[in-house]
Amino acid sequence: MIQVLDRQLVDLIAAGEVIDSPLAVVRELVENALDAGADRILVRVWWDQWRLEVLDNGQGMDVTELKTSVLPHATSKISTQADLQRIKTLGFRGEALHSLAQVARLTISSRSVASPGCGWRITYSPQGSPEQIEPVAIAMGTRVEVRQLFANFPQRRQAFAKSQQFWRPMVTYLQQLALCHPQVTWQLWQDERLRLSLSPGPNPEAILLQCLKSLQAGQLGYTQQSLSLPVDLENQATSAQLSLTFGYPDRCHRPRPDWLIIAINGRPVNVPELTQTILAVFHRTLPRQRYPLCFAHWQLPPQCIDWHRHPAKTEIYLQDLPHWQGQLKTLLHQSLAILGNDAPPRLNQLLKAAEPKGVYQLQGASSLTETVLGYPKAFKAIAQVCQTYVVVEHDQGIWLVEQHVAHERVLFEQLQRHWQCLPLEQPLVLQGFNPEQVERLQNLGLEIDPFGEDIWAVRSLPALLQGQEEIIAILRELSQVFSLSTAQAAIACRSAIKNGMELDRIAINKLIEQWQQCDNPHTCPHGRPIYLALDESSLARFFRRNWLVNPKTSGS
């Protein structure tokens, strides 16, 4: 017989969906703290006691707000149906605190700016009504205590019996949220042990350097840009912005896509289409089985986002998704085309080791770890070294460019833009190729016809391959690949200037000019670095010229 469930049971079922893990407790409370304007958030966990605590220095609540804050669907963030289309806060449903009261013992202490002298502490019943109210000495802000978590969900307690099952996701979540809100100080404590501490910084780059201790600033790039709006929003008084923090592919990459993070309006989200856009841009810039480090944070008009897809709001419906994908792709290409002029970290260590202690800094010299973005105003290839490297002088220092991989990158991008197979004057005869190999070559655009038993006539080839001495070996190699991109990379590698080949001044200047115009001048299609950069201050430090007040006016 179908029957209507009583309200208490309905609330308990709903609470189990909203608060499904210890991470959900932290997520809901931390997001409330950010909505309250906090710039210092502390999370404490006593897992043996099934107890959590979140403290913040946000605007706090007075006693009237405290009394109603845990009632079902009590919120200060929306009041009408129209508000659902313009959500600007992290929380808005009014479900989290009420759900917490259902699955744990909940106590909240808070003091607002308007509270005279003291704050208030309230312990709540499972229905969200106050059970005990008392004044308390507390600084402005809020302290939420969660005790006896999941006492009425024994199966859930058993699922989280091991601390490893929640610590890693909790640390990861707070790190990702810190990237979205770099102005906030974060701490995560386990009992009396500090598990995570992040200081505020001017941008996400400063947070990444704290999260990944092996990183150095010279490995990262940061850019922020206003975006064009979709056609349906052009006439509205709104704006969009995208900030990118990324690792240069020749200096920084990961064995897993664990630091490829998408965020929208202050919250990490899962949008597979945007993730794939980033992976596609970084394709053929990294070594095999390596992934980019990239944090992409959008500030979008609220009417573009539907947050009602998942209780945790980690999955969304995003309006005009192809438009935002295109904007992301464009900005990533622009950012990767920029050549950094600072020395890589290992060379920095060498230069710092050679620097005497207590010397004066060069006037106007930047730190070695400061990322210098933008093209030099002028450059000149001045020499070839060991018939392998090209020395390039520019207004900010020098580059040492490996000629083969630089030319390989140039040819690869040319092939991507202009892939075309041209007819041969005389067919090229192939022997020892099976039908599967021939089919793969045909899939690349080559025109090949049967010419006898196990003999094939090649009637067209990519322009770069025509006239190659080892054309049969090259075609045999190409017959093993399954994608056009892989074939283009192989052709570029085979056709590029070889190391050990002497180049005249005209040739090296032409090579450097073509290389600098590449979409990604950092790595070859197989992920090898192309250049080593040394700025003027790096050289001055190595040669101990730091005592000079102004090297441009001194003869020393």
Swiss-Prot record:
Which GO cellular component does the record give, naming just one?
A: mismatch repair complex
Give an example GO molecular function: ATP-dependent DNA damage sensor activity
**Which UniProt keywords are listed?**
DNA damage, DNA repair
InterPro entries for the chain: DNA_mismatch_repair_CS (IPR014762), DNA_mismatch_repair_MutL (IPR020667), DNA_mismatch_S5_2-like (IPR013507), HATPase_C_sf (IPR036890), MutL/Mlh/PMS (IPR002099), MutL/Mlh/Pms-like (IPR038973), MutL_C (IPR014790), MutL_C_dimsub (IPR042120)
Question: Which NCBIfam families does this entry report, sorted A to Z?
Answer: mutl (TIGR00585), PRK00095.2-1 (NF000951)
Pfam families in the record: DNA_mis_repair (PF01119), HATPase_c_3 (PF13589), MutL_C (PF08676)
Name the SUPFAM superfamilies for this protein: ATPase domain of HSP90 chaperone/DNA topoisomerase II/histidine kinase (SSF55874), DNA mismatch repair protein MutL (SSF118116), Ribosomal protein S5 domain 2-like (SSF54211)
Q: Which HAMAP family does this UniProt record tie to the protein?
A: DNA_mis_repair
Q: What's the superkingdom here?
A: Bacteria
Q: Report the protein's function.
A: This protein is involved in the repair of mismatches in DNA. It is required for dam-dependent methyl-directed DNA mismatch repair. May act as a 'molecular matchmaker', a protein that promotes the formation of a stable complex between two or more DNA-binding proteins in an ATP-dependent manner without itself being part of a final effector complex.
- Annotated source species: Synechocystis sp. (strain ATCC 27184 / PCC 6803 / Kazusa)
Q: Where are the coiled-coil regions?
A: none
* Gene name in the database record: mutL
Q: What is this protein called?
A: DNA mismatch repair protein MutL
Q: Which family does it belong to?
A: Belongs to the DNA mismatch repair MutL/HexB family.
Q: Does the keyword DNA damage apply?
A: yes
Could you confirm whether the keyword Metal-binding appears in this record? Answer: no
Q: Per the UniProt entry, what is one GO biological process? A: mismatch repair
